[in-house]
Amino acid sequence: MKSLPIDAVLPALREALAGRHEAVLEAPPGAGKTTRVPLALLDEPWLAGQTILMLEPRRLAARAAAERLAAELGEGVGERVGYRIRLESKVGPRTRIEVVTEGILARRLQDDPALEGVGLVIFDEFHERSLDADLALALTLNGRALLRDEPLKVLLMSATLEGERLSRLLDDAPVVRSEGRMHPVEVRWGRASQPGEHLEPRVVQTVLQALADEPGSLLVFLPGQGEIRRVAEQLGEALAGRDDIRLCPLHGELDLAAQRAAIEPAPAGTRKVVLATNIAETSLTIDGVRVVVDAGLERVPRFDPSSGMTRLDTQRIARASAIQRAGRAGRLEPGVCYRLWSETQHDQLPAYGTAEILQADLTGLALQLARWGVEPGELAWLDLPPAAAYAQGRDLLQRLGALDGQGSLTRHGQAMAELPAHPRIAHLLL
């Protein structure tokens, strides 16, 4: 088995979890935490044959993580390692490690709040701070406190330097820190980007330059599907007749076959140019990539309480995301990252992104908390849900008939909460 940076701290992690029911693991991109940690803890005495649940922020990452873990054991998925994602499940009677998406756990908790038979919940990539991850952690901690007789351990794994803040949330849990990625990544800065500047020509020019100057496949980060489509069209024209270059889009709306084509090794004698959204920022190893081209932008949903509408905003990424993206180039060998902004602009970026819970529509969260029977203040959060957005979500639920005049869940609301859809859609479906 190939050595990874995370291996050096696995004894300390085992010791931390043997002595406490919570721990935080801080490890940069490429350290190997997703692949190594669940297997390292599988035979710990305190687990006593129970299951490990590991949460991933996206379906593609969950499936890929399960496949890598199973391969490490020399087995197929569905034996000791399985996964559950929306509309797809691959687990068996021998499964001890279940890799699930965050929304799957949040819904499982509603039916099984004590998580019977589970001995450890691992929140991988917790630094992404998705709404589902925050909700799942809050419900896990509350269900454990109220309903568990046997210990349930919780491990938060983060690639950013927020370990102390996460530790405070978990009653000053021990923080275990791993050193850097396996291979160095050279960062090459671009000129300062300008507001309103068309992104695609700069991306295409940089990709063509990288193909000429560097070996290996490329991973290109773009904000959305529209930019991916336009860059693919322009690169297709520029690379016409080049049978050695394969263009592969990668975003959440693609089917499984297209997603696999993007992350699997390029055929012999060819190189890939993977055009991806931030779906490729964490948890995925795209074989053969040693060059990253980062446009430095992302598209995020932002809720406006004054209008009750959610809009998609394109914004600059945080420095933590830029580090994550660059790390994709150093997974398997020394790499290069082209950033399409200047070093001066980089220094002005926020250190971390804004947690989804602070800028999202909270109607779905309000419905799940009503089903759980609590108010936000009764649970443990890294960031408390904003009062205005939460109140607006509750108001919409009452207008949809999900809550009665006293704010209690109705039978219609119970049925809505069981559907994996926004409450507006669930109401229409019922």
Say what each PLM segment does:
Residues 1-428:
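P-loop NTPase motor module signature
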